[in-house]
Amino acid sequence: PKHKRFENLGADDKNGVFICLECLKKYDSIKVVFFREEETGCRGSSEAVMSFFDDVRFVIQPDRKGNSDLITSIGYADLCSEGFMEAIEPEKWGYMEENGLMTDILTLKEKGLEVSCLNVSCGYYNAHTDEEITVKKDLMKSLLFVEHIIEDCTNTYPHTQSDSYFSPYEFEDEIYDIRL
């Protein structure tokens, strides 16, 4: 064809879906939710029926690029408790705490979700580009880490969001003063 159209892999969503489906096959008791339009303002999660989460121990979102990021805060908003972090032993699994950007778990926290939440790297790179790839080894590392959390972290890990999300306008006065 004269005008070849390329669609990216969509691994930023598909890798997380793969992990969820694998967990659904393996575990008799697990809840999984898929939200629409995360990249365009978390529209699906903003309409979530929060009672769905009443009996969950924690929430894991496998939706982060790379192979070692563990998003435990977004801006100034913590997403999980110290007790949860101790229980999951991220360093032992090759994960490090990082600060992330807007995502569905932040929206759920803002809607009142009171359990610990994480966003974990799941093996994709170059999201939303023609060069998007999945590294299978990194995807499987994420799956094993998620399985570890499900199997070994059997307590409920409460966490109430106390800090607000970082607003880009929060420091507008300081930025303005610097430019003068």
Regions found by a protein language model. Give the residues of each.
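Short helix-capping/linker segments at secondary-structure and domain boundaries
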Residues: 26-30, 113-116, 153-156
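Alpha-helical scaffold segments in soluble metabolic enzymes
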Residues: 19-22, 107, 141, 145-148
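Zn-dependent metallopeptidase/amidohydrolase metal-coordination segment
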Residues: 96-142
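His/Asp/Glu-rich mid-to-C-terminal helical/loop segments that flank catalytic regions of hydrolases
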Residues: 126-180
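Gly/Ser/Thr-rich active-site loops/lids in small-molecule metabolic enzymes
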Residues: 80-90, 138-146
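Hydrophobic, Leu/Ile/Phe/Ala-enriched alpha-helical segments that form helix-helix packing faces
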Residues: 23, 88-92, 146, 150-153
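Acidic/histidine-rich catalytic neighborhood of metal-dependent amide-processing enzymes
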Residues: 3-83, 97-100, 104-105
